[in-house]
Curated annotation (Swiss-Prot):
Protein name (database record): Extracellular serine protease
GO MF term list: serine-type endopeptidase activity
Keyword entries, A-Z: Hydrolase, Protease, Secreted, Serine protease, Signal, Zymogen
Pfam families: Autotransporter, PATR, Peptidase_S8
Signal peptide (residue range): 1-27
Family from the record: Belongs to the peptidase S8 family.
Entry-linked NCBIfam families: autotrans_barl (TIGR01414), autotrns_rpt (TIGR02601)
Active site: D76, H112, S341
GO biological process: proteolysis
Organism the protein comes from: Serratia marcescens
Propeptide positions: 646-1045
Top-level EC class: hydrolase
Length: 1045
C-alpha cells in the first residue's frame, strides 16, 4: 500500500546538481525599491531568482506588500542558520540537522528545507537572492523529528498562517528484467503512474485514523503527517503542498488528495505544480490531476536559493570519520534546485504577501484569491496540468476574480462536498478590531485596509458576496457574479458595477456611484449614493422598506446625491439629509446659498410607488421637505426659526453669531446661474411634506442665490459646540487683547520714571537704572505677562523687551525735570493660533518737587505703536489665515506722592499714585478670506490708583554690603473693567463688540530686590517686579553686574 511506504523527502533527485556560492556580511542595505515604481524593485538580487518576475512580485512590492508581519511555517528537514534568515527564523525541531551517507560513507548535508525557506522568505539585503515574502518570518520544524519535542503541534499552535510542505511519497520506478531503472527518452526515470480511483480509495481507507489523529496534539509515526495537515487546516492555516516530481503524466499521491476525505478543508489546501521558465509544465513535475480544483502552478525549475554544504577544514574527505574528528564545517551559500519542492514555496510566499495585503481575510479566502487570479495556462479554465494556472501577484493584490461555488468547477475535477458555500463573506472589521477570534490565527487588524479596502478586479462566478464588519469595501470592477450581494455591516461602495441584486440590512450601507442590478434596503439598512456627492444607478428596482435610511448629501451649488432607477418602491424609510462641507468656503468672497435650493434625489423611468416616511435634517438651522413629482422625488431646503445666537453661550459668541445672522443674502448670483426646477402644471398644487408635517408650496423656479461664505458655513453646524468653536475663532479677539495689553504695559514707563526720580532724590531704588552724575540714565526692560481666560474670552501671554533712555537735571534745588525716550517690542500669543507683535516708540516728560520728607512726582508719556496681527480660523472644512498691520497710540498722565520715613534699621516710604491711560487705534483692515475683519478708529481709557509702602535696609560686613528693598501696593481700577474692540466682517456694516479678558477691579503690586556690593567698584543686583490680580499677572526679573572704573 502506498501509505505504508517509508516517507522520504522529495529532494532534487534525478534533477541534476547545483552550484554553491558564499557571501560575506554587508553594510546596511539601502533598498532602491520605491512605492508606485515596480521596475525599481528589479535589482540584481531580485533578478537572480527568475521566479519573482514570473509571478509579478514586483507589483506587490511597489504597493508596499512584502509579507511584513506574517509568519510562514515550513515542514521539511532542518533549516540552516543562514544570513538570509537572520532575525527571522525560529526552529521547532530538536536541534539536529539532516545528514546522509552513500555506500562509500561520504557525508552530505540535507539542505532541502534551507532552499525551500529561502524561496519563500529569504531577506532582501542586496546579497545573493531574496524570497517572495522577504519581510515575513519563518518557523521551521522537521517532517521526521523523533525526539521528545512535538514541533508539528507547536507549529499548529503558533502564529504561522501558511505552512509549506515540499515533500511526498514517490511511486515505484519501473525496472527491467535485470533490475535496472528504466529511463525515458527525456532522461527521466519511468515512474509507475498513480491511478485516480486507487489514490482516492487509499485516502478514504485512512480517513478514520487521520481524523482521529487530528483531534488531539499530533504524535509522530503512522498517519501523523496527514493528521498534522488536517489539524492545521482546521485551525485556520493554509496548507501549501508540492504536487510531486513523478513526471507530468502522473497525478499527486494520497496526501495531496486529503480533501476528498475531508472536503471541509479543501479551501485551506493548495497543491502546486512546477513550471519552467517558458510557462510549460516541467517534464519532472506531477500534474494537478484529481487535485485540479485546488491546484495552481508556479516556477520551480532551476531556482536559485539558499543552501548549505559540508566542507572539510583540512582539505580532506567529507565522510563520517572526518565528521567524528571535527574536521568538517557546515557553510551557508546559494545554489540552484528544481522540482515542485521549489514551486510550492513560491505560492507560500505569495500567500504571505496576500495575508499582509488582505489582513482581514481567512486562509481559505486567501486561497480563493490565489486561485481565481492565477493566469490561465493550457486548456481554458481549470485543467489537468496546471489547475487554475500560474500564480499572479499583480492581479492577486487587486482582490478575487471569482466567487466560487461547485457550479464553477468542471465535473471531472469536482471534489464531492466541496465549494458548498454560496457566499464569499468578507469582514472588513475596522481599525484595531480582532479577526478570527479564538483560533491560533487570532490577530488584531491594524493596517489601513482594516477600515477601508478596494477590489478592482472583475469578479465572476456563481457565488455571491456578503459584506460584514464596520469598515468599507469598494468594488471597482465590472462584476458579473451570479449570487446575491448582502450588506450586513459597514459600507459596500459600488464604484464599478454589480449585476446581482443587493440586499441591505442591519447596520449595512450601500454607497458608490456605480451600477447595481437592483437593491432592497430593509429595516436599519442604508443607501448613500456617491463617494461624496454622486449618483447610484439601478438597472431595475430600488426598494426602501419601513425603517430603512436614504442618506442624501446636498451641496449649495445645486448638486445632490441621487438614485437613478427603472422603478422605485417606497414602503417607508427615512430620508436623512446632510450638507456637503468638504469645500473651504472661507477662501471665497462669495458662495452660492444653500437656502431655497431644490434637488432631485430619486429619478426613475417607469415611476415611483409609495412615499418615504419622513425627511430628517441633522442641522438646527435648516429644514427639508420632500416633493413627489411623477417619476421623481425632489427635496427643498429652507431656514428654521432658530437663530445662530441661540446656540452661543457667551457674549463674544453671541455678538459674532448675531453679526453672521445679518450676512444672509437674497440676491441671485447672476442671471445665467439660475437653476430652474420644472414642475408639471398638474403638479403645481402639490405640497412639500416637511419632517414637521407642515405643508409648503413649491416655487416653480429656484435661483441660485449669492450667500456669504460664513453664513453658509454656519448652516452646516450640527451642534452648539461647533458654532461656539467657530464664533470664538471668527471674533478677532486678538485685536482687543493687544489693546488691553498696551494699556496694561504702559505702567512700565511711569514706574521707570518714578524709580528714576526716587533714585535722583537719594532714595534707595533698583540698580537696573544706570545713571551718571550728569543725569543721563538707561534701563533695559524685560517682562512677561499672562491674562487668565474666562467663560467669555480666551487668555493670552505677553512679553515685552526693550530699552528706555532719559536725561534729567535738578531744578531750583528741591525739584527735578527730565525727559525720556525708548523702544520696546511687545509680543502676544492669543488663543486659537493667533498672535500679535507691536513695535513701540516712546517719548515722555517727568519731574518732582520735594517738600522736606514729602515728595511729589508727576509725568506724562506718549507711545506710537506699529502692530502686526495674525490669526487662524479653522472649523470643520473651513480654514483661513487673516493678517493685519495698523497703527495705534497710547498716552498717559500720572502723579504720585511719597513720604520718606527714615530710621536706623529701615527706610520706609508710604506712597499713593494715580494714572490715566488713553489708547487709540487707527483703522484695522485684515487681509485674508471671507473671515477677514475690519474696524474703525476707536479708543478706550483706563484710570487706576495705587496705595502702597516701599521699604529698604542695608547690612555692612567686613567684605560686602548687602541692600534689600521691597514694595507692596494695592491697585484699584476705576470705571468699566471691560476691554473691548468693535469689529465687523469686510464688505458688511454689521458691527459687533469683542471683549478681551476684563481688568480686575483690584490687584497687588509686588517688588523685591537685593544689591550686593562686592567692593567699592562692583555691585551685583537681582530684582523682581510683579502686578498680580485675578485676571492678569505681569512679571519682570532683572539681574546685573555694575563695575565702575
Amino acid at each position: 500500500m502506498i501509505l505504508n511506504k517509508r516517507l522520504k523527502l522529495a529532494y532534487c533527485v534525478f534533477l541534476g546538481c547545483y552550484g554553491l556560492s558564499i557571501h560575506s556580511s554587508l553594510a546596511a542595505y539601502q533598498d532602491p525599491g520605491r512605492l508606485g515604481a515596480p521596475d525599481s524593485w528589479k535589482t540584481a538580487e531580485f533578478n537572480r531568482q527568475w521566479g519573482l518576475e514570473a509571478i509579478s512580485a514586483e507589483f506587490a512590492y511597489a504597493r508596499g506588500y512584502t509579507g511584513k508581519g506574517i509568519t510562514i511555517g515550513v515542514i521539511d528537514n532542518a533549516i540552516l542558520s543562514h544570513s538570509e534568515f537572520s532575525g527571522k527564523l525560529t526552529r521547532l525541531d530538536n536541534g539536529s540537522y539532516n545528514f546522509s551517507y552513500d555506500k562509500q560513507d561520504n557525508m552530505s548535508f540535507g539542505d532541502h528545507g534551507t532552499h525551500v525557506a529561502g524561496i519563500a522568505a529569504a531577506k532582501r539585503d542586496g546579497a545573493g537572492m531574496h524570497g517572495v515574502a522577504f519581510d515575513a518570518d519563518i518557523i521551521g520544524t522537521k517532517l521526521n523529528d523523533y525526539g521528545n519535542r512535538n514541533g508539528r503541534e507547536e507549529l499548529i499552535q503558533s502564529a504561522a498562517r501558511v505552512i509549506n510542505n515540499s515533500w511526498g511519497i514517490a511511486p515505484d520506478i519501473r525496472r527491467d528484467a535485470k533490475g535496472d531503472i528504466i529511463w525515458l527518452p527525456n532522461g527521466r526515470p519511468d515512474y509507475v503512474a498513480f491511478v485516480k480511483s486507487e489514490v482516492i480509495a487509499e485516502m478514504m481507507r485512512s480517513k478514520s485514523s487521520v481524523e482521529w489523529g487530528s483531534e488531539q496534539p499530533v504524535p509522530t509515526g503512522g498517519h501523523s503527517a496527514m493528521s498534522t495537515l488536517l489539524r492545521a487546516a482546521r485551525h485556520g492555516k493554509l496548507i501549501v503542498f508540492s504536487a510531486g516530481n513523478y513526471n507530468n503524466y502522473n497525478i499527486p499521491e494520497a496526501q495531496k488528495s486529503l480533501p476528498y476525505a475531508f472536503p471541509d478543508v479543501l479551501n485551506n489546501y493548495l497543491i502546486v505544480t512546477n513550471l519552467s521558465d517558458e510557462n510549460q509544465l516541467s517534464v519532472s513535475s506531477t500534474s494537478c490531476g484529481q487535485t485540479a480544483s485546488y491546484c495552481v502552478s508556479a516556477p520551480g525549475s532551476d531556482i536559485y536559493s539558499t543552501v548549505g554544504r559540508l566542507e572539510s577544514n583540512t582539505g580532506g574527505a567529507v565522510n563520517r570519520e572526518a565528521y567524528n574528528k571535527g574536521e568538517l564545517s557546515l557553510n551557508p551559500g546559494y545554489g540552484n534546485k528544481s522540482g515542485t519542492s521549489m514551486a510550492a514555496p513560491h505560492v507560500t510566499g505569495v500567500a504571505a504577501v496576500l495575508m499582509q495585503r488582505f489582513p482581514y481575510m481567512s486562509a481559505d479566502q486567501i486561497s480563493a484569491v490565489i486561485k481565481t487570479t492565477a493566469t490561465d495556462l493550457g486548456v481554458a479554465g481549470i485543467d489537468n496540468l496546471f489547475g487554475w494556472g500560474r500564480v499572479n501577484l499583480r492581479d492577486a493584490i487587486n482582490g478575487p476574480k471569482m466567487f466560487i461555488t461547485k457550479e464553477d468547477i468542471p465535473q471531472e475535477y469536482y471534489v464531492p462536498g466541496s465549494y458548498s458555500e454560496k457566499q464569499f463573506v468578507v469582514n472588513i472589521p475596522g481599525l484595531g478590531n480582532i479577526v478570527e477570534p479564538g483560533t491560533p490565527v487570532e490577530r488584531r487588524c491594524t493596517s489601513s485596509e482594516c477600515s477601508f479596502d478596494s477590489w478592482s478586479n472583475d469578479i465572476s462566478g456563481h457565488g455571491g458576496l456578503t459584506k460584514t464588519g464596520a469598515g468599507t469595501l469598494a468594488l471597482l470592477g465590472n462584476n458579473t457574479y451570479r449570487g446575491d450581494t448582502w450588506v450586513k455591516q459597514g459600507v459596500l461602495a459600488i464604484d464599478g458595477s454589480v449585476a446581482s441584486n443587493v440586499y441591505i440590512e442591519n447596520s449595512g450601507t450601500l454607497s458608490g456611484e456605480g451600477t447595481v442590478g437592483a437593491f432592497r434596503a430593509a429595516r436599519s439598512g442604508s443607501v448613500a449614493p456617491g463617494n461624496g456627492i454622486g449618483t447610484l444607478h439601478v438597472l431595475h428596482d430600488a426598494i426602501f422598506d419601513r425603517g430603512s435610511q436614504y442618506n442624501v448629501e446636498v451641496a449649495d451649488n445645486g448638486r445632490s446625491d441621487k438614485i437613478a432607477a427603472r422603478r422605485a418602491f417606497l414602503n417607508g424609510g427615512s430620508v436623512n439629509v446632510s450638507l456637503e462641507r468638504s469645500q473651504n468656503l472661507l477662501s471665497q468672497n462669495e458662495a452660492q446659498s444653500l437656502l431655497g435650493n431644490k434637488y432631485t434625489i430619486l429619478t426613475t423611468t417607469d415611476g415611483v410607488t409609495g412615499r418615504f416616511e419622513n425627511a430628517n435634517p441633522s442641522y438646527p438651522f435648516v429644514k427639508v421637505a420632500l416633493d413627489y413629482r411623477g417619476n421623481d422625488v425632489g427635496l427643498g431646503i429652507t431656514r428654521t426659526d432658530a437663530s445662530f445666537d441661540s446656540l452661543a453661550s457667551t457674549e463674544n459668541e453671541k455678538a459674532v453669531a448675531r453679526a453672521v445672522e445679518t450676512l444672509n443674502a437674497t440676491e441671485p448670483v447672476t442671471e445665467t446661474a439660475k437653476r430652474s426646477v420644472a414642475i408639471p402644471a398638474a403638479e403645481e398644487a402639490n405640497l412639500l411634506q416637511s419632517d414637521g408635517g407642515e405643508a409648503q408650496a413649491v416655487n416653480e423656479e429656484a435661483s441660485i442665490v449669492a450667500g456669504h461664505p460664513i453664513y453658509e458655513s454656519f448652516l452646516g453646524f450640527t451642534s452648539a459646540r461647533e458654532l461656539q468653536q467657530a464664533t470664538r475663532q471668527l471674533s478677532g479677539q486678538i485685536h482687543a487683547d493687544m489693546a488691553s495689553a498696551q494699556i496694561n504695559e504702559s505702567r512700565y514707563l511711569r514706574d521707570t520714571a518714578t524709580e528714576r526720580l526716587r533714585q535722583a532724590e537719594g532714595r534707595r531704588t533698583a540698580t537696573d537704572i544706570k545713571a551718571d552724575d550728569n543725569g543721563a540714565w538707561a534701563k533695559l526692560l524685560g517682562s512677561w505677562g499672562h491674562a487668565s481666560g474666562n467663560d467669555n474670552a480666551t487668555g493670552y501671554q505677553t512679553s515685552t523687551y526693550g530699552v528706555l533712555l532719559g536725561l534729567d537735571s535738578e531744578l531750583f534745588g528741591d525739584g527735578r525735570l527730565g525727559m525720556m525716550t525708548g523702544y520696546t517690542r511687545t509680543s502676544l500669543d492669543g488663543g486659537y493660533q493667533s498672535d500679535a507683535h507691536s513695535d513701540n516708540y516712546h517719548l515722555g516728560l517727568y519731574g518732582d518737587k520735594r517738600f522736606g520728607a514729602l515728595a511729589l512726582r508727576a509725568g506724562g508719556t506718549y507711545t506710537w505703536h506699529r502692530i502686526d496681527t495674525s490669526r487662524s480660523v479653522n472649523y470643520g472644512a473651513q480654514s483661513d489665515r487673516e493678517k493685519a498691520k495698523y497703527n495705534a497710540r497710547t498716552g498717559q498722565l500720572f502723579i504720585e506722592s511719597g513720604y520718606d520715613w527714615t530710621s536706623d534699621a529701615v527706610n520706609l516710604e508710604p506712597f499713593a499714585n494715580l494714572a490715566y491711560t488713553h489708547y487709540r487705534n487707527e483703522e484695522i483692515n485684515e487681509q485674508g478670506g471671507a473671515a477677514a475683519l475690519r474696524g474703525d478708529k476707536q479708543s478706550q481709557s483706563a484710570t487706576a490708583s495705587t496705595l502702597g509702602l516701599r521699604a529698604d535696609t542695608e547690612w555692612q560686613t567686613d567684605s560686602v554690603a548687602i541692600a534689600l528693598r521691597g514694595e507692596l501696593g494695592w491697585q484699584h481700577q476705576y470705571g468699566k473693567l471691560e476691554r473691548k474692540t468693535q469689529l465687523m466682517f469686510k464688505r458688511t456694516d454689521a458691527a459687533f463688540d469683542v471683549n478681551s479678558v476684563p481688568v480686575s477691579r483690584d490687584g497687588a503690586i509686588l517688588k523685591a530686590g537685593v544689591d550686593v556690593s562686592i567692593n567699592k567698584n562692583a555691585v551685583l543686583s537681582l530684582g523682581y517686579g510683579g502686578q498680580l490680580s485675578s485676571n492678569h499677572q505681569d512679571n519682570s526679573v532683572n539681574a546685573g553686574l555694575t563695575w565702575r572704573f
